[in-house]
C-alpha cells in the first residue's frame, strides 16, 4: 500500500509497497479518507520521542477517518461501506492500569494507528460509525475533539467566567469554540502568530494578544 513513512529524523518519504497491516479477527480494515497532522507527528519528524520511543520505519498520522473495507471474523456490527472514525490508541486491556481505567498509562500499548497510509486495521472497539450528518473530513477531528472535551471536564467551566487560551493550534482552536459554547463571558487568546490571532477573532475570541 501507499504510505508516508518516517525512517528517522527528517527522513520521510512516500512509499508505494509498504506492507498492509494484518486484519485480526476482532479488527476492522479501513480505507483512510482523511488524517489530521498532529503535533506529535511533528515531534517524531524532529526526532523527538513521545511517551514511547519511535520505532522506524513507521507511517505517521493517527487522527483518521475512513470507510470500512473488510471486517474480521468476530466483527458483526460493521460492514464494508460504513463510514467511521477511529480512536487511535491501542491498549492491552490486561495490565493493572487498563484494569483500573487508566488506559493512558498502559504498560503494553501497541501504539497508535498509522493514518498516513491507505489502510489501517484497528480493533473493533476503537472504531465508531458516523452519522450521515457528519462528513469524513470533519470526523478526522474526533480524536483531538475528544481530548478537548476531557479537558473541559477537568476545567469545570462556570457560566460567566473568563478563560485564557495560550496557543491557537488545532487544540487551542477547538478549546476556544467549546469555551464559548459552555458560557464563558470572555475568551482571551495568547498567540504569537498574527494569522492565528485573526483566526481567533473569527472564532469568537474576546481579545487576542501577542
List each language-model region with its residue ranges.
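NAD(P)H dinucleotide-binding glycine-rich loop of Rossmann-like/cofactor-binding domains
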Residues: 90-166
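Short N-terminal binding/cap micro-motifs at the start of the first secondary-structure element
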Residues: 10-15, 39-40
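Glycine-rich beta-strand-centered segment in the early N-terminal region that forms part
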Residues: 20-35, 49-96, 131-134
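Cytochrome P450 core scaffold surrounding the K-helix E-X-X-R motif
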Residues: 40-46
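Mid-domain Rossmann-like dinucleotide-binding core that forms the NAD(H)/NADP(H) cofactor-binding site
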Residues: 135-210
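Residues that mark the start of a beta-strand
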Residues: 2, 27-29, 162
Amino acid at each position: 500500500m501507499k504510505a508516508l513513512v518516517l525512517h528517522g529524523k527528517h527522513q520521510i518519504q512516500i512509499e508505494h509497497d509498504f506492507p498492509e497491516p494484518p486484519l485480526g479477527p476482532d479488527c476492522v480494515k479501513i480505507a483512510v479518507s482523511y488524517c489530521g497532522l498532529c503535533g506529535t507527528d511533528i515531534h517524531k519528524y524532529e526526532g523527538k520521542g513521545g511517551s514511547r520511543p519511535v520505532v522506524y520505519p513507521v507511517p505517521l498520522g493517527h487522527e483518521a477517518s475512513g470507510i470500512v473495507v473488510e471486517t474480521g471474523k468476530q466483527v458483526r456490527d460493521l460492514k464494508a461501506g460504513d463510514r467511521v472514525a477511529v480512536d487511535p490508541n491501542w491498549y492491552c486491556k490486561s495490565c493493572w492500569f487498563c484494569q483500573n481505567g487508566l488506559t493512558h498509562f498502559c504498560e503494553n500499548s501497541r501504539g497508535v494507528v498509522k493514518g498516513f497510509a491507505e489502510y489501517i486495521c484497528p480493533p473493533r472497539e476503537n472504531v465508531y460509525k458516523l452519522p450521515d450528518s457528519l462528513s469524513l473530513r470533519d470526523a478526522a477531528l474526533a480524536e483531538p475533539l475528544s481530548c478537548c472535551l476531557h479537558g473541559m471536564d477537568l476545567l469545570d467551566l462556570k457560566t460567566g467566567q473568563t478563560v485564557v487560551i495560550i496557543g491557537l493550534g488545532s487544540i487551542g482552536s477547538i478549546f476556544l469554540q467549546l469555551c464559548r459554547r459552555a458560557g464563558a463571558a470572555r475568551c482571551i487568546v495568547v498567540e504569537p502568530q498574527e494569522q492565528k490571532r485573526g483566526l481567533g477573532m473569527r472564532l469568537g475570541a474576546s481579545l487576542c494578544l501577542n
